[in-house]
């Protein structure tokens, strides 16, 4: 371990000294911006949403595009709910250049775009009574995101815009939250015109990568390793490494591979000039309990509520000795789904099972070359995915 540390220090020293190993490219200005600053850079506002259990979520809005900025009339509303567990925040919808980011593309197409954040990530770390230093603050998983965060966000957006319905777009865990919420709360589903599921993760039976390996460890060991509070929060060290190391020509690929190790490899489809922007905004953090919940999905081979570890604790939370199962077969909402053939998390075999369980599936497309991150950062995402999303929204308008 000491030898590894010395090697890392040696490499970093060479890079910072501007030695013979290569050159340092200019830092992208957006690498030093948070999501609010990125959006405000384009002239758009931020909102705060309070959930029923007291969490305060940051929601970002792009009310108009570049071509329709003087159009003040009502527009169809889109809610982008990225929430991939412990890696991302709303910035991921806008961290590519404007003509390659779904948030900006939808705004330019005439939609009122809202982008949400989960409790516990960089932009949703406030609570009415709790502090992030308290264990109680971090006692949540995607159960609470589906039960509280998504309904609060949708209701706030509809109230603010005066609309009766909106389009909901989710990626990864954002889809998990949507499927749970819309199947458990039919009244909430009625407020959504159509659900767009990008690389949905509802089971990990055929998945591969680090998450599957973590899933083999006992819950108590995971808590011993990571504590009981936050997991992979955004940090000053990560930002420093992103802006000082990931801008170096020979290090960009290494920084990009950090993401690929989790989600699958497709290096040719990533904008390498934006790696420092990606890495300064990811990871954005979540709770250890949320991470443990996902490892339970791996262990038990089914999507169910969080297992509190004993019959007594489960009975206290659920009035039964075991966690209740989630069934999406009850969801009555037009749904379009896209999947990737090289996605390590939303594996094709898991997706094929999911497709048989969606009662109102109206569209599905598999993109054979794509991994989990191509849906948000892929260079070819506009013409292979985003244009189809816009077309379907206008069709179901």
Swiss-Prot record:
Protein EC: 3.1.1.13
Q: Name one Pfam family in it.
A: Abhydrolase_1
- Report the coiled-coil segments: none
The Swiss-Prot or TrEMBL record annotates one GO molecular function as: lipase activity
Under catalytic activity, the entry for this protein gives: a sterol ester + H2O = a sterol + a fatty acid + H(+); cholesteryl (9Z-octadecenoate) + H2O = cholesterol + (9Z)-octadecenoate + H(+); a triacylglycerol + H2O = a 1,2-diacylglycerol + a fatty acid + H(+); 1,2-di-(9Z-octadecenoyl)-glycerol + (9Z)-octadecenoate + H(+) = 1,2,3-tri-(9Z-octadecenoyl)-glycerol + H2O
Cited InterPro entries = AB_hydrolase_1, AB_hydrolase_fold, Lipase_euk
Q: Which keywords describe this protein according to UniProt?
A: Glycoprotein, Hydrolase, Lipid degradation, Lipid metabolism, Lysosome, Signal
What the entry says about post-translational processing?
Answer: Glycosylation is not essential for catalytic activity.
Compartment(s) where it occurs, according to its Swiss-Prot or TrEMBL record: Lysosome
Q: What does this protein do?
A: Catalyzes the deacylation of cholesteryl ester core lipids of endocytosed low density lipoproteins to generate free fatty acids and cholesterol. Hydrolyzes triglycerides (1,2,3-triacylglycerol) and diglycerides (such as 1,2-diacylglycerol and 1,3-diacylglycerol) with preference for the acyl moieties at the sn-1 or sn-3 positions.
Its quaternary structure?
Monomer.
Descriptive protein name? Lysosomal acid lipase/cholesteryl ester hydrolase
The species this protein was found in: Rattus norvegicus
The encoding gene is: Lipa
């Amino acid at each position: 371990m000491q030898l590894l540390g010395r090697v890392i220090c040696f490499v970093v020293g060479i890079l910072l000294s501007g030695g013979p190993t290569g050159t340092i490219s200019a830092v992208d200005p957006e690498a030093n911006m948070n999501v609010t600053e990125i959006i405000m850079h384009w002239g758009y506002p931020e909102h705060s949403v309070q959930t029923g259990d007291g969490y305060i979520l940051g929601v970002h809005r792009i009310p108009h595009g570049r071509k329709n900025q003087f159009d003040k009339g009502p527009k169809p509303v889109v809610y982008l709910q990225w929430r991939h567990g412990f890696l991302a925040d709303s910035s991921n919808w806008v961290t590519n250049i404007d003509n390659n980011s779904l948030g900006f593309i939808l705004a330019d197409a005439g939609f009122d775009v809202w982008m949400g954040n989960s409790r516990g990530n960089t932009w949703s770390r406030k609570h009415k009574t709790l502090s992030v230093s308290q264990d109680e603050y971090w006692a949540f998983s995607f159960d609470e995101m589906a039960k509280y965060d998504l309904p609060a966000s949708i209701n706030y957006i509809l109230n603010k815009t005066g609309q009766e319905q909106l389009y909901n777009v989710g990626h990864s865990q954002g889809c998990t939250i949507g499927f749970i919420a819309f199947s458990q709360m039919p009244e909430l589903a009625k407020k959504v015109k159509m659900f767009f599921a990008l690389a949905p993760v509802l089971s990990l039976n055929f998945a591969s990568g680090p998450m599957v390996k973590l899933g083999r460890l006992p819950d108590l060991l995971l808590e011993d390793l990571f504590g009981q509070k936050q997991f992979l929060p955004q940090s000053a060290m990560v930002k420093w490494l992103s802006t000082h190391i990931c801008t170096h020509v020979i290090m960009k690929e290494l920084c990009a591979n950090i993401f690929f190790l989790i989600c699958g490899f497709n290096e040719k489809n990533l904008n390498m000039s934006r790696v420092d922007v990606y890495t300064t905004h990811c990871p954005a953090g979540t709770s250890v309990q949320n991470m443990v919940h996902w490892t339970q999905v791996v262990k038990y081979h089914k999507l169910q509520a969080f297992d509190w570890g004993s019959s007594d604790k489960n009975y206290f939370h659920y009035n039964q000795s075991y966690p209740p199962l989630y069934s999406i077969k009850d969801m009555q909402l037009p749904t379009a789904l896209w999947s990737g053939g090289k996605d390590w998390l939303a594996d094709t075999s898991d997706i094929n099972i999911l497709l048989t369980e969606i009662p109102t599936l109206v569209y599905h497309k598999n993109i054979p070359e794509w991994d989990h991150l191509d849906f948000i950062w892929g260079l070819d995402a506009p013409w292979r995915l985003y244009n189809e999303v816009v077309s379907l929204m206008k069709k179901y308008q």
